[in-house]
C-alpha cells in the first residue's frame, strides 16, 4: 500500500461512491489496509446479539472503512476539496499546505 495522505482528525470530503460530496472528520486511519473511517460516511446497519458489553442487543449503526483514495482533504478557507504539498519551514518543521490557496493544515 502507498502512504495515506490524510491523518486522524482531518476534515475530508468524499469524492466518489454512494456518499459522494459528504464532508466529515477522519476518526481513524488503517494504513495496512489503505482505508480510513470517516464520521457519518459509509454507515452500515449491524444486527447485534446481546452480549456482556451490550446486554440490550438490537440494530446498531456504525461507520465502515472506505478506501483512502476516495477522500480528499477539505480546506476551510477555500471551501473545497484540495490537494496538498509539504513544505519545510526555516525552523525545520514540516507543514502541509493547500495547493489552491496556500493555507497550512
Curated annotation (Swiss-Prot):
Sorted UniProt keywords: Ribonucleoprotein, Ribosomal protein, RNA-binding, rRNA-binding
GO MF terms held by the record: rRNA binding; structural constituent of ribosome
Protein's GO biological process: translation
Source taxon at top rank: Bacteria
InterPro entries on file: KOW, Rib_uL2_dom2, Ribosomal_uL24, Ribosomal_uL24_KOW, Translation_prot_SH3-like_sf
UniProt KW Ribosomal protein keyword: yes
Gene Ontology cellular-component terms listed: ribonucleoprotein complex; ribosome
Record-linked Pfam families: KOW, ribosomal_L24
Subunit organization: Part of the 50S ribosomal subunit.
HAMAP family (alphabetical): Ribosomal_uL24_B
Function: One of two assembly initiator proteins, it binds directly to the 5'-end of the 23S rRNA, where it nucleates assembly of the 50S subunit.
Family per record: Belongs to the universal ribosomal protein uL24 family.
The name this protein goes by in its record: Large ribosomal subunit protein uL24
Amino acid at each position: 500500500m502507498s502512504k495515506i495522505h490524510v491523518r486522524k482528525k482531518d476534515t475530508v470530503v468524499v469524492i466518489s461512491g454512494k456518499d459522494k460530496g459528504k464532508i466529515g472528520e477522519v476518526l481513524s486511519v488503517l494504513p495496512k489496509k489503505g482505508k480510513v473511517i470517516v464520521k457519518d460516511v459509509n454507515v452500515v446497519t449491524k444486527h447485534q446479539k446481546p452480549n456482556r458489553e451490550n446486554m440490550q442487543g438490537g440494530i446498531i449503526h456504525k461507520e465502515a472503512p472506505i478506501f483512502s483514495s476516495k477522500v480528499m482533504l477539505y480546506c476551510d478557507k477555500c471551501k473545497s476539496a484540495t490537494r496538498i504539498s509539504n513544505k519545510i519551514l526555516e525552523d525545520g518543521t514540516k507543514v502541509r499546505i493547500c495547493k489552491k490557496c496556500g493555507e497550512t493544515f
